[in-house]
Each structure stands twice: as structure tokens, then as C-alpha cells.
Regions:
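Stable alpha-helical elements in mature extracytoplasmic
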Residues: 16, 51, 69, 98, ...
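Solvent-exposed, acidic/flexible segments
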Residues: 10-13, 66-70, 91-95, 152-153, ...
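Sec-exported extracytoplasmic/periplasmic mature domains
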Residues: 3, 22, 60, 78, ...
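Periplasmic-binding protein-like
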Residues: 34-43, 125-163, 173-196
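A ligand-binding cleft/hinge motif common to bilobed small-molecule-binding domains
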Residues: 11-23, 75, 103-127
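Short, glycine-/small- and polar/acidic-enriched structural segments
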Residues: 1-47, 65, 129-131
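Bilobed "Venus flytrap"/periplasmic-binding protein-like clamshell domains
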Residues: 36-100, 104, 115
Length: 200
């Protein structure tokens, strides 16, 4: 939790961003281009679970410790009348470990950050069946600045121009944000926060 009010710039996940904007005096200035926080629910390819409907109460779901993924996943599971308390949750060290649990039949399903899922090895993905992938394009990590930060305009411009030189491009690619950042309006941030609140 971020309680210190002396941090001027924060790159936050959508849930933390909501709290920081509503309660801690931060404003969104930018978000990565084409990089929304989608998630995937998958089961073992060899199991009898081929659709979300096949998941039943008492099933074990493996996942890395990621609140964003879990909340979006729970919203998707509402469609098949499953709530958090209906399932057993196995928190793994990382997403690869969650995939292994499902493949070894130690869990009936796993939740993944979509980007991580699509980056798994071909061999791993061949052993998994995607039950559903979220499509909430408006939800993403955001760059926040503290109200009253005196260099906000310069900083915003620097962030938006970061991809324009080779060094910046290389850094962004390393961070998985090859296309850089785009400006984010207060309206866009409010819309995202409202959406996050409906997920909680």
C-alpha cells in the first residue's frame, strides 16, 4: 500500500490507481499504448473442462498473487454462477507454476495475465485450453502524478516523447511497452475507475 504522500510519480495497476486518484491526490497523465490488462482462464487440454460451464463448485483455481487478475476473473465467473467462496484458491509463485498445477491435474483451472499466458512456451500452451479471455480494453496500468507537482507538463511531454529516440525505444521495448505511452485524460481515468469499482 502506498501511504507516503511524498512520491511524485507512480506507475500503478488499475486497482491501486483508483485508490490513489480518489483518495491520495494523484492524477493520471499517461498509459501504455495498446497494453490493456486482460486476463485468461484456462484448463488442462486433457481434462473434461472445455468451457467455463464445466467448472463446478469446489474446483481448485491456481494463480499468481495478482488482485487485478482475480477480480476480473471473478467477474467473468459470475456468468456461470461461481463466486470466490465457491472455489479453492491456490496461490503460486508465478504464472508458470499455475500452468504446471493445471497440467499436472493439481488444479482444475488457472487464471493468467493475458500477456503472460500468450508468452508461455508453445509446449505449455498446447497442454492448456483457454476457457475465456477478457476484453476490457479500457483497463490498463497508468502513470500517475501527485497534484501540485511543479514539473508536470515537462514530465508528461518527456513520457509521451520517450519512444521517439533509440535509447527510449530500447528501454520501452525491454519493459514490454514498445509503442510507448499515450496521454490519458481525466475523463478516461474516471471511466476506468468506475469500471474497476463495478468489478470489486
Amino acid at each position: 500500500k502506498i501511504n507516503a504522500g511524498n512520491i511524485d510519480l507512480i506507475y500503478a495497476n488499475p486497482f491501486d490507481a483508483a485508490t490513489l486518484i480518489r483518495e491520495k491526490g494523484y492524477r493520471a497523465i499517461a498509459r501504455p499504448v495498446g497494453k490493456s490488462d486482460e486476463m485468461v482462464i484456462a484448463a488442462a487440454e486433457k481434462s473434461a473442462i472445455n468451457t467455463l460451464e464445466d467448472l463446478s463448485k469446489g474446483a481448485t483455481v491456481a494463480m499468481a498473487d495478482n488482485r487485478d487478475v482475480k477480480l476480473i476473473g471473478l467477474r467473468l465467473l459470475e456468468a456461470v454462477d461461481l463466486e470466490e467462496s465457491d472455489l479453492n484458491w491456490e496461490v503460486t509463485e508465478n504464472y508458470q507454476a499455475a500452468a504446471r498445477k493445471v497440467i499436472k491435474d493439481e488444479a482444475q483451472a488457472a487464471m493468467f495475465l493475458a500477456e503472460v499466458f500468450h508468452g508461455l512456451s508453445r509446449l505449455t500452451k498446447m497442454q492448456l485450453t483457454v476457457l475465456i479471455e477478457s476484453d476490457l480494453a479500457t483497463i490498463s496500468h497508468v502513470l500517475l502524478v501527485k497534484d501540485g507537482f511543479d514539473k508536470e507538463d515537462e514530465l508528461t511531454q518527456a513520457v509521451l516523447d520517450f519512444h521517439k529516440d533509440d535509447e527510449g525505444k530500447a528501454t520501452l521495448t525491454e519493459l514490454g511497452m514498445a509503442e510507448g505511452f499515450e496521454a490519458m485524460s481525466e475523463e478516461d481515468a474516471e471511466f476506468m475507475i468506475d469500471l474497476m469499482e463495478t468489478l470489486q
